[in-house]
Curated annotation (Swiss-Prot):
Keyword Nucleotide-binding: no
Organism: Deinococcus radiodurans (strain ATCC 13939 / DSM 20539 / JCM 16871 / CCUG 27074 / LMG 4051 / NBRC 15346 / NCIMB 9279 / VKM B-1422 / R1)
Record-given protein name: Uncharacterized protein DR_A0161
Keyword Ribosomal protein: no
Keywords: Cytoplasm
Pfam families, per the entry: PhoU (PF01895)
Function statement: Not known; probably involved in phosphate transport and/or metabolism.
């Protein structure tokens, strides 16, 4: 192998390492948002919104770095086989993580109102937050090293979130005659944001499963 080829491989490896590090950092930061939400919901901490928004800015910054790095890599390095699949997985998945961070902000904005009333079924919402945190940490474990079984577990956990969401929304919409409309709307928005957050984590998990299930043509045995 020529010195030029070795240098190109080294640059490609360095770019992939930076992208992967930012990809994993986004997942860690999202888990941090969910831990903050879970603790605030349990303790009645009204300052969590600022913390969640600060962490969301870190997610946005990592997303921007990955986008620039990935586009440069695809244009200049022409990755193939596993390198190309990994690059595309990260490039396609970071918008899902960015949106999940946005939904964490939506939850944070409504957390105190949800906790203060009964319209949103606070005990069930606490369960949903715990499941979402478990989804985020399981996805992180499934991403390095990549693990299809753990990625599948993320989807199974999301089924539990969806079941909680369906029951809660049905009860919220049925409502009690004395429930304030504002409380009902806040509860509905909080539950919807939590459910959508989980869906974005599932999107990433499904891409991980697909990457591991099908080898690229040049990876397949002759």
């Amino acid at each position: 192998m020529s010195a030029g080829s070795l240098g190109g491989r080294s640059r490609l490896d360095e770019q992939l390492e930076r992208m992967t590090a930012d990809f994993l950092s986004m997942q860690d930061t999202l888990a941090g948002q969910l831990r903050a939400l879970q603790a605030a919901f349990a303790q009645g901490d009204t300052s969590v919104r600022e913390e969640v928004e600060r962490l969301d800015r870190d997610i946005d910054a990592a997303n921007a770095r990955i986008e620039g790095e990935a586009l440069h890599l695809l244009a200049r390095q022409s990755p193939v086989a596993h390198d190309l699949k990994l690059t595309l997985l990260i490039l396609q998945s970071t918008p899902d993580l960015e949106r999940a961070g946005d939904y964490a902000k939506h939850v944070a904005r409504r957390l105190s109102a949800l906790r203060a009333g009964t319209a949103g079924h606070p005990s069930e919402f606490a369960q949903a937050l715990a499941l979402l945190l478990q989804m985020a940490t399981t996805l992180r474990a499934a991403s390095s090293p990549m693990n299809a079984a753990l990625a599948h577990e993320v989807r199974a956990l999301d089924d539990q979130v969806d079941a909680l969401y369906d029951r809660a929304v049905e009860q919220v919409l049925a409502g009690r005659p004395d429930a304030a409309l504002a409380d009902t709307l806040e509860a509905s928005h909080a539950w919807r944001a939590a459910e959508r957050l989980g869906d974005h984590l599932v999107n990433v998990a499904q891409r991980t499963e697909r990457l591991l299930a099908r080898p690229a043509p040049s990876d397949a045995p002759a």
